[in-house]
Amino acid sequence: MVRIKDVADYVGVSTATVSNVINGKEQRVSKEVREKIKKALDEMGYVRNHTAMMLAQTTSNMIGVVIPHKDGMKIALEDPYYSAFLGNLEYEIRQHGCYMYLIAQQSEEEIIRQAIAWNLEGLIVCNMPADELNSLSEKYSRGIVSIDSYIENQSDVINISTDDFGGGYQMGKYLIAQGHRKIAMLADNDDTVDHHRWMGLKQAMDEAGVSISETDHFLFSPSESVRELQMEQFFPDLQNYTALFVASDFYALEVSSFLQSKGIRIPHDISIAGFDDLLYAKLARPKLTTMSQNMGKKAKMAVEALLYLQEKRKLERQKQKQNATLKPNLIENPDADNPWTLPVKLVERESVRRIV
């Protein structure tokens, strides 16, 4: 690897002079010498050591992204939701001249250790339980943006969420409008996101006078092997419903595949609807009716929220009298009362049929 000293010796200048050119401090170097150094850098194939440069600076331009570990999955990226969201998040981070540093959720101590070791600008934390997130925020002060954690926004923590209750409510109203009265929900937990979707569904059905209870709420394991056994156990009961609302597209497609393997015709015998509107939803057969959340906007909001916290922290350090305020219109969110909550919309495809 070519070093700064090698370039300096080649041109016949000091290492400080070469360093000034590399770091954009060209006003300190004559035009003639500057051009010689740049030519030498190209000819010798010099590549900047970004790791060393980052550790030497007060800022790293690296944003930490913490993704959860899901029981039964080797890596969270096996879940297509996280793959899609992280792709959008990396793009938005890059648009702001920063880099994404991915942390698969480990202990609180390990998250903080990596954040400090890599001088991260802040953390975007996905689906961390509220108690763990509150504990982390007490020990890490550079700013945290949580995704779908359902905590109260704090001075150094902002939660970005989807209107999960509204999504469940809209789906319930839609299924009822299609003539369905025997509706069940399937999910892998009854916490945070999935809980709010279930409560929204219940609200819609209660308003319509349609009976629904906890016996219509099927919870299965995040572990695929365990889930397969549970679906076999659920199958006799699932045949009593005309429509199934599944908490994610990933699980909805899995449920659809399982039922079709048992000879159930989708949607003729049982209708199925999901949540997220992933790419696979429109590629499935039949194409999946689902609630769509705008992952691109969600990622954009997350990065802007973290940059807002950075700016606020900077102003506080400078002891300026006027606090920074991020106006809701900067994130192009029509809901001014809940600027950090994303609306959802129904996408009607082929997996739900109307019952006459």
Feature locations, PLM:
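Short beta-strand segments enriched in small/hydrophobic residues
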Residues: S19, L55-I75, Y174, K182-D188
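Hinge/beta->alpha junction and helix N-cap segments in small-molecule ligand-binding domains
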Residues: G72-Y81, Y99-E110, I160-Q170, L186-Q230, ...
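Flexible loop/turn connectors
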Residues: E228-V356
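Short acidic capping loops at alpha-helix termini that bridge into adjacent secondary structure
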Residues: K182, I212-D216, I266-S271
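An alpha-beta-alpha
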Residues: Y169-A208, L326-V352
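Alpha-helical recognition/docking segments in bacterial nutrient-uptake
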Residues: V2, M62-K173, E232-N240, F250
